[in-house]
């Protein structure tokens, strides 16, 4: 008997709050509504929460984190069900390479790691790893393991897939003159060699065509990858981010990509951990409407229900979506450090 899907719902940012930013209203803060903090963190997603966690680890507490929603988490938000929680969006974390020391430190703090392998590789505890098969594709009424559909593939499809995989292996092994990988997490450790950065000037689709790939199955596979991670198809995403998807999680050629750490609530487990450490510094339902650079630092103006509040700060960490920066940061449109106005935002449906 056909099973009826449960009714769904859309959760996330409040439209009415977003309209306040778009309308670019001016707000006057009453004199008795100003506070002073050395640092204000704007945004309570993983970026803002991890920044707050880092400050606390450095024994720095003179900061405030401002989140516009009633709950923190952003795109790592989760819900509470019976008997277990569930993710609304981001739901796994690839086990990091040993060089990613900050992230390894966090995972150790959360007791998610088992230890090290013979080559120093990070080993996560089995109970926190995604069960096999990690990935499946649904085709003509059946599930098949993996994301590339081997069933029904022609000899030419298989040949092109093998050629594509060889290119990926070559990039995984590639190092620049200083020993840096082309694609790795964190991004700060990626090579800036022109051979690598030039890949950001063409689309992934064009790169595939330039390499002579014509297999529809291979194009579907690559298109799925960019849609999955970036919300863009292969002709919208750059070749750099396309190759990053396939290379950054592979320790060395010939081995499988890193396993996934996951929990019932997805990446909500990290949200809960961070929040437990910094909850006294968090202000929920505070929508930041203006960030104004001053001679002494930065003034941050926000709405708290019907109240207008302000914070005199030395510095701010802007951990909100980048497309909002031109609407919030005073002068950002005039001296923008990057093309923030060109950012497009896609909703994340699960």
Task: Identify the residue ranges that each predicted region occupies.
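Central helical "cap/lid" subdomain
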Residues: 286-350
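Active-site/ligand-binding neighborhood in enzyme catalytic cores
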Residues: 176-297, 312, 329
């Amino acid at each position: 008997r056909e099973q009826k899907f449960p009714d769904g719902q859309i959760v996330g940012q409040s439209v009415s709050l977003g309209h306040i930013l778009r309308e670019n209203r001016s707000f006057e803060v009453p004199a008795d509504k100003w506070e002073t903090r050395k640092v204000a963190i704007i945004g309570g997603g993983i970026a803002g929460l991890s920044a707050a966690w880092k400050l606390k680890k450095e024994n720095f507490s003179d900061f405030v984190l401002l989140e516009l929603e009633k709950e923190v988490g952003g795109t790592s938000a989760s819900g509470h069900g019976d008997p277990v929680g569930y993710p609304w969006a981001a739901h796994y974390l690839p086990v990091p390479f040993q060089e990613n020391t900050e992230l390894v430190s966090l995972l150790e703090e959360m007791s998610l790691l088992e230890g090290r392998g013979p080559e120093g590789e990070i080993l996560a505890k089995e109970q926190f790893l995604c069960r096999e098969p990690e990935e499946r594709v649904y085709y003509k009424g059946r599930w098949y393991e993996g994301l590339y559909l081997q069933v029904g593939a022609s000899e030419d499809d298989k040949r092109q897939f093998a050629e594509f995989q060889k290119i990926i292996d070559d990039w995984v092994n590639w190092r620049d003159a200083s020993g840096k990988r082309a694609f790795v997490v964190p991004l700060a450790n990626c090579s800036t060699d022109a051979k690598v950065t030039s890949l950001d000037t063409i689309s992934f689709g064009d790169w595939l065509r330039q390499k002579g790939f014509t297999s529809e199955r291979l194009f579907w596979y690559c298109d799925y990858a960019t849609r999955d991670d970036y919300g863009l198809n292969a002709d919208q995403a750059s070749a750099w981010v396309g190759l990053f998807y396939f290379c950054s999680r592979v320790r060395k050629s010939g081995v499988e990509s890193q396993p996934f750490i996951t929990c019932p609530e997805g990446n909500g487990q990290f949200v809960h951990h961070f929040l437990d450490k910094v909850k006294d510094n968090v202000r929920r339902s505070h929508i930041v409407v203006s960030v104004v650079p001053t001679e002494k630092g930065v003034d941050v103006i926000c709405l708290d229900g019907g109240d207008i509040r302000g914070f005199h700060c030395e510095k701010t960490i802007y951990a909100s979506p980048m497309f909002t920066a031109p609407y919030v940061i005073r002068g950002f449109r005039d001296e923008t450090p990057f093309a923030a106005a060109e950012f497009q935002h896609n909703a994340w449906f699960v």
